[in-house]
Amino acid sequence: MKQKIFNYILLSWMVVLTGYTIIESRKAPPDVEFELKLNDREIMKDLEANVTNMLAVCEYYDVKHPRIVTAQAILESDNFESELFKEYNNPFGLYNSKKKDYFKFKHWTDAVAAYISMVEHRYAGGDYYRFLEELPYAQDSRYIDKVRIIESNLPP
């Protein structure tokens, strides 16, 4: 009898802990500084935002489709000239729904790390454009077409 009670209590605690773990894992992550390679800030802090540097940073961080992601940055930031980009260092228009404002980064290269954490980590393979279509990323119905055109005009 004691063994049954013990097993019941043990099982109950396991269920509670499992449930708690699942709930905690689904909560929004705390506000974090999006950096993948912490020592790189000194190296990258002087990089000007342009196509060449965006491609290089995307490749450095092993972005799976650096040309498409660079094209997204060009479109979203109006070729790195938008107010959002200038004030927030946010070339992708990444939005913080918790704060009801766009994410603000110390440097535009941090936004590349954030893109990986917030968008690309969901990518399971296959057609990246289809993946982007399925995300609630852009409100423009021609977004994917525009990104394709920009990508096709990027330097090799």
Where on the chain are the PLM-derived regions?
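Catalytic cores of secreted/periplasmic lytic hydrolases that degrade extracellular macromolecules
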Residues: 2-156
